[in-house]
Every structure is written in structure tokens, then in C-alpha cells.
Design a protein with these regions (language model features):
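Phosphate- and other anionic-substrate recognition elements at nucleic-acid/protein interfaces
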Residues: 2-6, 10-125
Length: 125
């Protein structure tokens, strides 16, 4: 099965992929608006033939934005699952530092967060 992990943001969306048991950071989507985020993500999902989409759900106000994003993807008939993303950004930054990532490469933190979200899902499915 082909999986896509998503760390949703209103400016940047981190993406990670997996075709088995190991999630890998993939790319960052730059978005201008909520509708732009839904459109760009939907295109990637369809073009990539992903069978399962895993979206991290944070607490608080951003959680409401993520819920709206998930709802918009659901309305397009996409197979979306929501998982807790508590500490995913912190873990992602820790992994990047341990791997010696430069400040320039740390701009990919959202993709690493998406990989943490997806890996947690894969480990617990």
C-alpha cells in the first residue's frame, strides 16, 4: 500500500511517503490559502496514487484548521485517517539535529514532521 503522511500548515505542508513499514520525508508544499492547500494536496494524492492519507491532528485552534482540511479531502473521496501529532515537530527537529542537518536543510522540518506522523501511524496500525 502507498501511504502519504501530511503535516498541515497554512503556509507550508510537510509531506512524507511510505510503501511499507518505513516513512521518509518527501517534500514541502508552499501554499497561499486554505483552498490552495486543499487543491495542491488533492492533486498530489491523485497523481501519486496514494491509497491511504495520514494527517496529523494538533491540539487547539490549528486542530480546527486541520479538521476542515481533512473534511475537504474527504468530500473529494480521498481515504484520509487522522492521528495525534503531539511532539512530532519536536521529534523531527531532534532527528534533523542528530543527523547534522544544516540550518538551510532545517527548512524541511515540516516534511520530517510528516514522516514522524506517518511512522507513528505505521508502527501502530
Amino acid at each position: 500500500m502507498k501511504y502519504l503522511g501530511i503535516d498541515f500548515g497554512l503556509r507550508r505542508i510537510g509531506l512524507a511517503i511510505s510503501e511499507g513499514d518505513l516513512a521518509s520525508p518527501w517534500q514541502i508544499l508552499e501554499v497561499k490559502s486554505f483552498s490552495d492547500a486543499v487543491e495542491k494536496t488533492s492533486i498530489i494524492i491523485k497523481e501519486g496514487h496514494f491509497q491511504k492519507i495520514v494527517v496529523g491532528l494538533p491540539e487547539g485552534k490549528m486542530g480546527q484548521n486541520v479538521a476542515g482540511f481533512v473534511n475537504a479531502l474527504d468530500k473529494r473521496g480521498l481515504n484520509v485517517e487522522v492521528v495525534d501529532e503531539t511532539l512530532s515537530s519536536k521529534k523531527a527537529l531532534q532527528v534533523m539535529i542528530e543527523q547534522g542537518a544544516s540550518q538551510k536543510k532545517r527548512r524541511f522540518e515540516d516534511a520530517y514532521s510528516a514522516a514522524e506522523i506517518l511512522q507513528n501511524y505505521l508502527d501502530n496500525k
